[in-house]
């Protein structure tokens, strides 16, 4: 069910990061060098999850693996134990909660009209539902952390803290972000462009679907541009 996927991606997946943040406050302070294997493992796991995304043909699986790759960055940022890293991790958990939930919602919008989640069979939506294509574009741009979204702010904080801790990590981070951009572009082009395989009886989008997407996108913009709204 779509509601379960949205709650799982937006809330339940973030409980692990929240638990690590709480445990870090309880544990005695240790040298960050002790956590080097875990930071490398988290970043390498993010890259592997991103590479897995490139191999997916199922839309829902692709979005699910995308969530896993972002949580790798969150874990790496928390373990460094710097204020910037912690702020970036919390911001990315909030930002990705909105983004992944919006992507699952869009995937369900596509599934309700095509009755399939295979990427190649859902193409050509820009001819039939242009407004939905706009939502897909905005959400994918958020997923690859373009300004002025909260994703950009959080990834900038994480990148700065990781680079300050160890400049070599910029290689793993850069590779991860490059692959993220690749599969996001692949997902958008596969589902929206090209000749459509649907008939002319496709159900139009409802106002509730547009409202739902607006309630995902607007907070991401507003929290980044006016953080005093929540702080």
Swiss-Prot record:
The keyword Glycoprotein does not apply. It comes from the Eukaryota. One of its GO terms (cellular component) is mitochondrial membrane. The keyword Aminoacyl-tRNA synthetase does not apply. It catalyses: a ubiquinone + NADH + 5 H(+)(in) = a ubiquinol + NAD(+) + 4 H(+)(out). Its EC number is 7.1.1.2. Keywords: Electron transport, Membrane, Mitochondrion, NAD, Respiratory chain, Translocase, Transmembrane, Transmembrane helix, Transport, Ubiquinone. Its main location: mitochondrion. It is a multi-pass membrane protein. The chain crosses the membrane at residues 1-21, 34-54, 61-80, 84-106, 118-138, 156-178. It is found in: Mitochondrion membrane. One of its GO terms (biological process) is ATP synthesis coupled electron transport. GO terms for molecular function: NADH dehydrogenase (ubiquinone) activity; ubiquinone binding. Core subunit of the mitochondrial membrane respiratory chain NADH dehydrogenase (Complex I) that is believed to belong to the minimal assembly required for catalysis. Complex I functions in the transfer of electrons from NADH to the respiratory chain. The immediate electron acceptor for the enzyme is believed to be ubiquinone. Belongs to the complex I subunit 4 family. This is NADH-ubiquinone oxidoreductase chain 4. The lineage of its organism: Eukaryota, Metazoa, Chordata, Craniata, Vertebrata. The gene is MT-ND4.
């Amino acid at each position: 069910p779509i509601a379960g996927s949205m709650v799982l991606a937006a809330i339940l997946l973030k409980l692990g990061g929240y638990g690590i943040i709480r445990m870090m406050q309880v544990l005695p302070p240790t040298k960050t060098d002790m956590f080097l294997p875990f930071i490398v493992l988290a970043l390498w796991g993010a890259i592997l999850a991103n590479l897995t995304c490139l191999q997916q043909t199922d839309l829902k699986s692709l979005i699910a693996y995308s969530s896993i790759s972002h949580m790798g960055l969150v874990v790496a940022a928390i373990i460094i134990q710097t204020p910037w890293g912690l702020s970036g991790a919390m911001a990315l958990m909030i930002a990705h909660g909105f983004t992944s939930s919006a992507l699952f919602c869009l995937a369900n919008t596509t599934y309700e009209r095509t009755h399939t989640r295979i990427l190649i069979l859902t193409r050509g939506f820009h001819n039939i539902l242009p407004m939905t294509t706009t939502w897909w574009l905005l959400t994918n741009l958020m997923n690859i952390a373009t300004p002025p979204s909260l994703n950009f702010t959080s990834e900038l904080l994480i990148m700065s803290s990781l680079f300050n801790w160890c400049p070599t990590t910029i290689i793993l981070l850069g590779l991860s972000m490059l692959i993220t951009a690749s599969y996001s572009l692949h997902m958008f082009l596969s589902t929206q462009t090209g000749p459509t395989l649907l008939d002319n009886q496709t159900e139009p989008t409802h106002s509730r679907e547009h409202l739902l997407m607006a309630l995902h996108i607007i907070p991401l913009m507003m929290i980044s541009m006016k953080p005093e709204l929540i702080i």
